[in-house]
Amino acid sequence: MWVCGALCRTRAPAQLGQRLLPESRRRRPASASFSASAEPSRVRALVYGHHGDPAKVVELKNLELAAVGGSHVHVKMLAAPINPSDINMIQGNYGLLPQLPAVGGNEGVGQVVAVGSGVTGVKPGDWVIPANPGLGTWRTEAVFGEEELITVPSDIPLQSAATLGVNPCTAYRMLVDFERLRPRDSIIQNASNSGVGQAVIQIAAARGLRTINVLRDTPDLQKLTDTLKNLGANHVVTEEELRKPEMKSFFKDVPQPRLALNCVGGKSSTELLRHLAPGGTMVTYGGMAKQPVIASVSQLIFKDLKLRGFWLSQWKKDHSPDQFKELILTLCDLIRRGQLTAPACSEVPLQDYLCALEASTQPFVSSKQILTM
């Protein structure tokens, strides 16, 4: 997710950087390192050595694969998406930054190839996803610690598994954790065509909630509207329509939302607040407009509106690995029942990463870029 303003940037564990040390500098075993051999390795990865424009700093490198032993797991990556948070991390504008050089990618799905003698929770053939961000999923294969992985069922679609660990988890937690919503209650959200937005629509529909979905007025507005309604959206309005006085009559027929989900900020978040029911909550999980969230004194005093933030990485820190696994299994049940699908995706071979990076940063591109290995 895009995050604006100065953030407190914690550093990912040191072993992330150790995985990419040149052979001459390695002092202990690591999951992978830059190949010191002139012969290309069979392990390829998208690596960045400093922060900046992803198209300029990300390179396709050959890495060495460490031996599998102890609690290590050899994973062949199958697919990994490019999320806004991945772009922010490469740019250096995120709340968690791995040590450099680093492999890009925080999300994806892989298949276990081999396990060390101390591994008890996974076996060859299992599908796995990262337990936490910063693992570096834009690579063909790697050796990870068992604790860095979570198993997922292999009977769900590959694209769903590859995009399971970030956006659907964020959507579910925001719908469940901030307001006690009952069937037929309304929520309102901006950036409705984003990965989180599409997951919100589907999970809300599965829970009997109504969604009011705000979009920018784009050239393909009708196509986006049809897509969201096919996912279960009840209402789709543009940013411009939301500002019009006619919205008062709209909310005579539709209950005012008790929950607003903001990924934009600026004027867009101001409009979400304006239409919230008294006592309602706006949860901010991104800032695509790179503008502050502004609430009036009257909204806070007379409507008692609540402003909250959500970051999945912090939620994971505050909850146990078993609770995250339970969340993943809950989402997998929705996928199996046909109530949660992956966002529209474009699969791009790893070697064509520049095309994927460019598409992922272009406006009005609603298809998520997924790197295939």
UniProtKB/Swiss-Prot annotation:
Q: Where is the transit peptide?
A: 1-53
Keywords attached to this Swiss-Prot or TrEMBL record, sorted alphabetically, are: Acetylation, Fatty acid biosynthesis, Fatty acid metabolism, Lipid biosynthesis, Lipid metabolism, Mitochondrion, NADP, Oxidoreductase, Transit peptide
Organism of origin is: Bos taurus (Bovine)
Would you say which domain of life the source belongs to?
Eukaryota
Q: Output the GO biological process annotations, alphabetical, semicolon-separated.
A: ceramide biosynthetic process; fatty acid biosynthetic process; fatty acid metabolic process; intracellular iron ion homeostasis
Q: What does this protein do?
A: Catalyzes the NADPH-dependent reduction of trans-2-enoyl thioesters in mitochondrial fatty acid synthesis (fatty acid synthesis type II). Fatty acid chain elongation in mitochondria uses acyl carrier protein (ACP) as an acyl group carrier, but the enzyme accepts both ACP and CoA thioesters as substrates in vitro. Displays a preference for medium-chain over short- and long-chain substrates. May provide the octanoyl chain used for lipoic acid biosynthesis, regulating protein lipoylation and mitochondrial respiratory activity particularly in Purkinje cells.
Give the quaternary structure.
Homodimer.
Q: Which reaction does it catalyse?
A: a 2,3-saturated acyl-[ACP] + NADP(+) = a (2E)-enoyl-[ACP] + NADPH + H(+); (2E)-butenoyl-[ACP] + NADPH + H(+) = butanoyl-[ACP] + NADP(+); (2E)-hexenoyl-[ACP] + NADPH + H(+) = hexanoyl-[ACP] + NADP(+); (2E)-octenoyl-[ACP] + NADPH + H(+) = octanoyl-[ACP] + NADP(+)
Q: Which gene encodes it?
A: MECR
Q: Which residues carry this modification: N6-acetyllysine?
A: 61, 252, 267
Give the Enzyme Commission number.
1.3.1.104
**Biological classification of the source:** Eukaryota, Metazoa, Chordata, Craniata, Vertebrata
Q: What class of enzyme is it?
A: oxidoreductase
GO cellular-component terms in the record? membrane; mitochondrion
List of residues that carry N6-succinyllysine: 61, 252, 267, 316
Family named by the database record: Belongs to the zinc-containing alcohol dehydrogenase family. Quinone oxidoreductase subfamily.
Protein's recorded name? Enoyl-[acyl-carrier-protein] reductase, mitochondrial
Q: Name one Pfam family in it.
A: ADH_N
InterPro entries assigned: ADH-like_C (IPR013149), ADH-like_N (IPR013154), GroES-like_sf (IPR011032), Mito_Enoyl-ACP_Reductase (IPR051034), NAD(P)-bd_dom_sf (IPR036291), PKS_ER (IPR020843)
